[in-house]
């Protein structure tokens, strides 16, 4: 990042943004986490649900058991939990359309009134040479058969390849078909080689669209979630940034913003406990007030413990990929007694080695010890 320019040269009004404006030209790129600290808000936790497999078939009992465990953990701490279905944790890129639809139907049958978020992406565009919004239509139509859900428009190669103005137009074209609230999705190339995060102008344009209620951003190398949060809070935008940073869980909790992460699938009780511990006693809904009358400072050690565990779940392979986190998640959930099988989707090549169960047991030593010390249930 270049040196901080003089504050009077920084853009602070959205009307001054241009499609080519970079974040470092704005005031929001220079807002610190400390400036955004929030001990009052109780944002939701959006937890991506693993679709476990037994052999080559989905383990439906395991799938539902994971969601029951998540909801029970969140209810204990008074946290709003929104399951995220058919995202990367749910093998969206390997799911056939019928299996995609079955995931949603089985969820809705078991949980008839629970809100959920569902990922949609482009289908059938492998031979395309340009962006086609209609590629999103098959999964979008399947998702919108259900009520009380939000649609996460996951980025795709040709949508991401567009310049900011045409990329905005692409999202707006997809939004014409939205009948449910929409969530936009951005990645850094550190996750997917062709991905680029949103420029400030593009974020402002999308955040101003009435059908988009929020967005998820996942980055490893630059703090775009802080940029988003600073801009949206400063401008009072009716748009909720969601952190997709599995390596930075504490940041979202500390600044009072929602999480939308695959990591939550294996550590929901820890995240919910941390969210409650971070709240000041003055928050009426705080489940476990402290004797000191303020937030529980032991949360800092809980942050460390849960992040050290998720750093193991999301560890890089020698190709620089974390995609096998899904397999690690299955082993972690089996170690917790939530599921009984750790197979992956038969067409997914992202797998850990045969010692993964032991690796996860080792990674869970500290968080389990912290859970016992703090009286956090459902993580024995």
Question: Where does each model-flagged region fall?
Answer:
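C-terminal alpha-helical cap/extension of soluble enzyme domains
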Residues: 6-36, 44-52, 73-77, 257, ...
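Active-site beta->alpha loop and helix N-cap motifs at the rims of alpha/beta catalytic domains
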Residues: 10-197, 349-352
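A short, hydrophobic/aromatic-rich structural module that often spans a beta strand
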Residues: 20-26, 37, 170-177, 228-241, ...
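General structural feature for long, well-ordered alpha-helical segments within catalytic domains
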Residues: 59-66, 99, 103, 132-135, ...
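Alpha-helical scaffold segments in soluble metabolic enzymes
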Residues: 106, 173, 205, 227, ...
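Catalytic alpha/beta core domains of metabolic enzymes, predominantly
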Residues: 177-322
